[in-house]
């Protein structure tokens, strides 16, 4: 725990209630198949979450079956279904074989009167009945006070008392539209904690409408909350929810709270959810974003090379990430020398400064600088011909509505001409598979770790930037490379070729 946080008095342990498969799936445009839900649930279980809210069983037959499939996996995590104050929702949770039910109890004036068209006494009675019904059916019961942060505490006390009396085991305080500030959250949870006592698990569920979800969740824990609702990557309705990876790392690193999470798996989990939901993780996303441990500035990179703690709060390995140094107009000599050394290129101080000047000129023109650019500049400064193990002479692709995407390619490998062809799910896939086939025949192998394509301009003639991350299966070396073109197939092929040449240059060194 950092000294600045030493006055905090959070609990020693906090339960992690993950709602990626329920609230997270309510992200506009996201619809997970039962198989995709199962894959995420398994990964959540592997990293150590306490509860997986697998969905809302009463929503559809497919949702019920998906929850049942997860429940039958015999995971260590508790499997939970959401429910309204409706006995039929509880029946659906039972049919889905869930361990627990999360009953949502609307409490604010606008929710009770405008949405439910009930009065508060009716809500109390309905909540009490449904909690008792769920308990009678053998379910662990958690209730959440929907829009709790816009509800006066006196009424929340009544709701909590009624639900506890009916058998609820966990009580939730919800910032449903993200209007709470951390100071207010701390005070409210402190009062609720005092009301319900230490034996009851008080939970908190925060939305990110004003960008405060993580801060509010942490404030609630500082005030005594012993369970937090989170989603992977912070996905969810509107602006999303408190992010699992952020909340966990803040609690573990800044407050010394044990979350039970295997943090070294967080980045892996993040990428899985990103891939299956299609919701991109911003590069600057805390903890798991592509740039979370990436350095370009010469001053920062030089500091990192001397002592990693100068510009990193934690080692990237702690969350399963990796440290990267990228080339750009802010780069310094330390990073250039390090990358040239990896390529087996030795330069003196004067040559190093000339390479730096040329790289900065490229950066000033708005170009994304790759290792291939650095290698080409270095070889020019050294006055020797560019070494390219692999060059593309030509390639063609064919695709159509009733045509299987097919590609053929002609490459030169150390001067030897090689032809290959392949099919794929699309022209990019077919082209890269043809390249792989040509290289494997010559004993050259690589693994694709990550592929990203992004339109830089609008229109059908948009410039597309492709980034790839490649690994040498023999040495374990990883390189990043990229290319920008109007043609995504050309951009992809160039990015792969540059990356493979970088791997081979490193291997030679």
Swiss-Prot record:
Catalyzes the condensation of pyruvate and acetyl-coenzyme A to form (R)-citramalate. It catalyses: pyruvate + acetyl-CoA + H2O = (3R)-citramalate + CoA + H(+). The lineage of its organism: Archaea, Methanobacteriati, Methanobacteriota, Methanomada group, Methanopyri. Residues 14-267 form the Pyruvate carboxyltransferase domain. One of its GO terms (biological process) is isoleucine biosynthetic process. Disulfide bonds: none annotated. It comes from Methanopyrus kandleri (strain AV19 / DSM 6324 / JCM 9639 / NBRC 100938). This is Putative (R)-citramalate synthase CimA. Pathway: Amino-acid biosynthesis; L-isoleucine biosynthesis; 2-oxobutanoate from pyruvate: step 1/3.
